[in-house]
Amino acid sequence: MLQRDTTIINKLGLHARASAKLTQLAGNFVSQVKMSRNGRQVDAKSIMGVMMLAAGIGSTVTLETDGPDEQEAMDALLALIANRFGEGE
């Protein structure tokens, strides 16, 4: 199991489009992918769960991956967040 804190840096935070990109990417991996903020943990493969975190710009979230491709999943998700979900601000 891997766990890593990261900060949401895109201007609109985890809005619908960003959440969709994150859940779609998470769904490509066999590993379980969880995301948490302020004590609430959700399945990162669930768009409703991710949106319920209400993570705006500057929010710190914790990613957790567990399974055979956990490192690849973690690296890909961190890259997506660092790239501002491809929104090119």
Curated annotation (Swiss-Prot):
Its main location: cytoplasm. It is found in: Cytoplasm. PROSITE patterns: PTS_HPR_DOM (PS51350), PTS_HPR_HIS (PS00369), PTS_HPR_SER (PS00589). Coiled coil: none annotated. GO terms for biological process: phosphoenolpyruvate-dependent sugar phosphotransferase system. The keyword ATP-binding does not apply. GO terms for cellular component: cytoplasm. Residues 1-88 form the HPr domain. Keywords: Cytoplasm, Phosphotransferase system, Sugar transport, Transport. The active site is at H15. It holds the Pfam family PTS-HPr. Transmembrane segments: none annotated. It comes from the Bacteria. NCBIfam families: PTS_HPr_family. Belongs to the HPr family. General (non sugar-specific) component of the phosphoenolpyruvate-dependent sugar phosphotransferase system (sugar PTS). This major carbohydrate active-transport system catalyzes the phosphorylation of incoming sugar substrates concomitantly with their translocation across the cell membrane. The phosphoryl group from phosphoenolpyruvate (PEP) is transferred to the phosphoryl carrier protein HPr by enzyme I. Phospho-HPr then transfers it to the PTS EIIA domain. PANTHER family: PHOSPHOCARRIER PROTEIN HPR (PTHR33705), PHOSPHOCARRIER PROTEIN NPR (PTHR33705:SF2). This is Phosphocarrier protein HPr.
